[in-house]
């Protein structure tokens, strides 16, 4: 393998900006900011959504009312879609 062509794979802190949750994982992401955590300095990557804030993982999912949407569509376009003229 060639030397010097691979990105630096290191520990990085990812911070969820919606709730402040931080976790350390390994990544090759390039960052401009650093953060001190547990007495060590790590590169900081700010993210909008993580497993701590995503509705799928938190159990606060919104169930879409597809039946209501279909009824709304039929009420709006039902006459034209069925081929009947007024």
UniProtKB/Swiss-Prot annotation:
* Pfam families named in the record: Ribosomal_L31
**Which Gene Ontology cellular component annotation is one that this UniProt entry carries?**
ribonucleoprotein complex
What is the name of this protein?
Answer: Large ribosomal subunit protein bL31B
As for family, the record states: Belongs to the bacterial ribosomal protein bL31 family. Type B subfamily.
Its subunit composition reads: Part of the 50S ribosomal subunit.
Q: Which GO terms describe its biological process?
A: translation
Query: Is ATP-binding among this UniProt entry's keywords?
Result: no
Any one Gene Ontology MF annotation carried by this entry is:
structural constituent of ribosome
The UniProt keywords, alphabetically, are: Ribonucleoprotein, Ribosomal protein
Keyword Ribonucleoprotein in the entry? The reply is yes
Q: Which SUPFAM superfamilies match?
A: L28p-like
- InterPro entries per the record? Ribosomal_bL28/bL31-like_sf (IPR034704), Ribosomal_bL31 (IPR002150), Ribosomal_bL31_B (IPR027493), Ribosomal_bL31_sf (IPR042105)
**Highest taxon in the source lineage:** Bacteria
Q: Which Gene3D superfamilies match?
A: Ribosomal protein L31 (4.10.830.30)
């Amino acid at each position: 393998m060639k030397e010097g062509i691979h990105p630096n794979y290191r520990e990085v802190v990812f911070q969820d900006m919606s709730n402040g949750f931080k976790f350390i994982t390994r990544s090759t992401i390039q960052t401009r900011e650093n953060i001190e955590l547990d007495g060590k300095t790590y590169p900081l990557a700010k993210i909008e959504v993580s497993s701590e804030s995503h509705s799928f993982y938190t159990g606060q999912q919104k169930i879409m009312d597809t039946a209501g949407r279909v009824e709304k569509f039929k009420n709006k376009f039902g006459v034209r879609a069925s081929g009947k003229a007024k």
